[in-house]
Amino acid sequence: MFSSVNTCWTLVGAFLVYFMQAGFALCEAGFTRAKNTGNILMKNMMDFCIGTPCYWLIGFGLMFGGTGALIGGFDSFIQGDYSHLGLDIPLWVYIVFQTVFCATAATIVSGSMAERTNFKAYCVYSAAISLVVYPICGHWMWGGGWLQSMGFHDFAGSAAVHNVGGVIALLGAWMLGPRIGKYDKDGNPHAIPGHNLTAGALGVFILWFCWFGFNGGSSLSLSTDATMTLTGLVCFNTNLAAAVATCVTMIFTWLRYGKPDVSMTLNGSLAGLVAITAGCDTVSPFGAFFIGFVAGILVVLSVEFFDKIAKVDDPVGAVSVHFANGVWGTIAVGLFSTGSNTAHAGLFYGGGLAQLGTQLLGLVCVDVYVVVVMFIIFKIIDKTLGLRVPAEVEIDGLDIHEHGLASAYAGFAISDANSAAMTPNENTDLGEDDVTKASAKQMDAAVPVVREPVIHDGVYDTGMHKVSIIAKLAKFDQLKTALNDLGVTGMTVTQVMGCGIQKGTPEKYRGVPVDTTLLPKIKVEVIVSRISVDAVVEAAKKALYTGHIGDGKIFVYNVTRVVKIRTGEENYAALQDVE
């Protein structure tokens, strides 16, 4: 007899865990560059869609098809008898719940190998993870395998999901090598910030929300007082550990870097969630507090270690979040377990080293298995399909070469975070933001004018000039209106990247100084003959002025010759009847 309450609760948990795919997609896309956004989204979609039939094919059978020490059984398409699981929910409900967990393990790998992985290779190794890697590890810990028989405890997947995915992420990033430009010739890291911190933050919020289904749903039951109490404790511990880890990461980066690091703090939230996942059912809130506290520091130190010492390029911090804190969360069970739901209490609760030893043994064996199998798979893929894309593909971006996608943001001007528009600050403020009150000196400082000397000898003087205006994107409409009011009827407009003497806004990304920042600008070019050049210059200066250095720059050139291609007309005549 099935329990409708437990069935509904398990399905809700499964749906929430599925929605974690959206969180991972946004998080990874935001923490990488815009030219690879489509590729990131495609990978997060396909690892789930590839993993689902693979897990149905043999994965679930290997994981739960029997109680053997090493594997469950070979049950293609899940047709066997699973009564030994003792479920009070329909088998297919349980299969759905386990399928979305399997997909999560594969998704973790995407982030660390982002921006340089061959898409074909990604599809192949995602299938391998869902077919043989995750199911066998899962059987050892959850399916009646040898680790579960020894008393190894991993309630919702710090080891089975996050550590497994994190180990593969570490191995893959190491075998791929760093992105072009990540390290200089001396091995010093260069920061490569993501292009959309807003998307990254939204992804973290989605993941945090879905984690209540990831951990809470793992109880598989809400039908008794005991299971309702357990689920409540699981959800509370999950939230507490994540919140504490976030606060600790913020404070730690504030002390370490001089300012609280946003991207690192977001990763701190995920680190706390990963770390509490193994023991959320067996630790007290005090234990959850300390687990989150350590996770908040560990994620920062881990990012710095892999970035600066190990030289493993992990664009989104997946290794530090999932591997480092998956290991920590699994070990923490052996330290903080109160003895409920585990074979032994943790070291700090009088249980001695028994539970801790089992947790450590399980981690070592699982990681060795994963590394050996995935190293072989990666090597085979590298020798056949190629694991990494060519340099020119990486430089141009995977979107255009791998998917024929010019931009994931059609219709929008999107630049990477290291190309973000510079905001006014005290170093550029000229003391007057009203153009009508600004002095000539302030106007010239905000929008300097560079005039090319007019050459008479040997140069035909047409009486025409080209005025080239470099301005902020936000000021284009005002500039266009000012030029139209003046009578300028033709202009050429292009988007450009560059920086002036300010060299962009100085910043750090995950503790690494960001190189010279290129800022998105608009370049407007007009050719004038009858209209006074000085009138054009003054109109542009008034339209662009905000009272800060960097408002824009104007270049004035002498035009020696203009030719209209269609008619052959030259100079002033060539400018008439503009097509």
Language-model regions: role of each:
Residues H401-L405, A420-E579:
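Positively charged, small/polar-rich N-terminal and surface patches that mediate targeting and assembly
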